[in-house]
């Protein structure tokens, strides 16, 4: 089996490292990649093809893990060449997922839940071909939601509503605590009710959010566009916070 990767960030690198089998070959391309990404690709040992069109043509499973902004363009440009399953793992809205479904055959809507570079992330999938990906449970927990493309997209957006709003609130409250010289005490009192590892998890969440604020802002914009008939006061405040 050949698995092709569009994008070689944390998601793709994690999958490449987790899904290890002599019966599976990973492929990607350096085409249009940054110098840093090219170096990562070379160091990984993954099979490198000349173009992403070649990657799409040769893949039994083609995984798109790029960014919310580029997900649809990637599908429009290369989806027609994909003969196997097209697994989209980008944090995109259901509307964008449905647009991608028009561009590719055999779309499976997917999301990795949990800290992406942990040893036990969980993959959720939906779509008519989702059953064919359940073999991945041998390498990471894989759960099928339904046969309907878009269901996972809705779930991961709802999760993002919670996680990104909480992250923005953590950033704001910890900065105020730091201003008053009470940062350690702030996490200590919260740990009483939130658990002993709350400080560690919170600092990790804050760091991740600040280091990836552009991508997370794009994801929040997708949420606001899709749930435009809902009360999104907290989401809009989180977006404003991340854009500062």
Predicted regions and their residues:
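Rossmann-like NAD(P)(H) cofactor-binding subdomain of soluble oxidoreductases
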Residues: 52-54, 60-63, 68-122
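Interdomain hinge/lid region at the active-site interface
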Residues: 192-244
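Small-residue-rich helix-loop
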Residues: 182-195
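Rossmann-fold dinucleotide-binding core
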Residues: 92-163
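Cationic-aromatic interfacial patches
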Residues: 173
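Conserved beta-strand segments of alpha/beta enzyme cores
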Residues: 25, 47, 85, 106, ...
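NAD(P)+-binding Rossmann beta1-loop-alpha1 motif at the extreme N-terminus of oxidoreductases
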Residues: 1-57, 116
């Amino acid at each position: 089996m050949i698995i092709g990767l569009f994008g070689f960030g944390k998601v793709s690198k994690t999958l490449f490292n987790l899904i290890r089998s002599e019966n599976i070959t990973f492929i990607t391309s350096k085409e249009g990649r940054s110098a840093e990404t090219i170096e990562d690709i070379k160091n990984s040992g993954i099979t490198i093809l000349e173009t992403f069109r070649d990657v799409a043509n040769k893949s039994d499973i083609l995984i798109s893990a790029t960014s919310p902004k580029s997900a649809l363009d990637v599908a429009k440009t290369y989806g027609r060449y994909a003969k196997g399953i097209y697994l989209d793992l980008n944090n995109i809205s259901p509307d964008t997922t449905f647009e991608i479904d028009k561009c590719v055959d055999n779309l499976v809507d997917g999301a990795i839940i949990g800290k992406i570079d942990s040893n036990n992330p969980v993959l959720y999938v939906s779509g008519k071909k989702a059953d064919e990906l359940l073999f991945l449970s041998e390498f990471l927990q894989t759960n099928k939601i339904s046969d309907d493309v878009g269901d996972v997209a809705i779930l991961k957006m709802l999760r993002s509503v919670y996680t990104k709003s909480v992250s923005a609130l953590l950033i704001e409250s910890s900065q105020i605590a730091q201003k008053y010289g009470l940062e350690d005490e702030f996490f200590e009192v919260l740990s009483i009710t939130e658990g002993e590892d709350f400080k560690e998890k919170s600092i990790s969440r804050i760091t991740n959010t600040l280091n990836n604020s552009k991508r997370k802002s794009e994801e929040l914009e997708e949420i606001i566009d899709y749930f435009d008939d809902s009360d999104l006061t907290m989401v809009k405040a989180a977006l404003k916070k991340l854009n500062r």
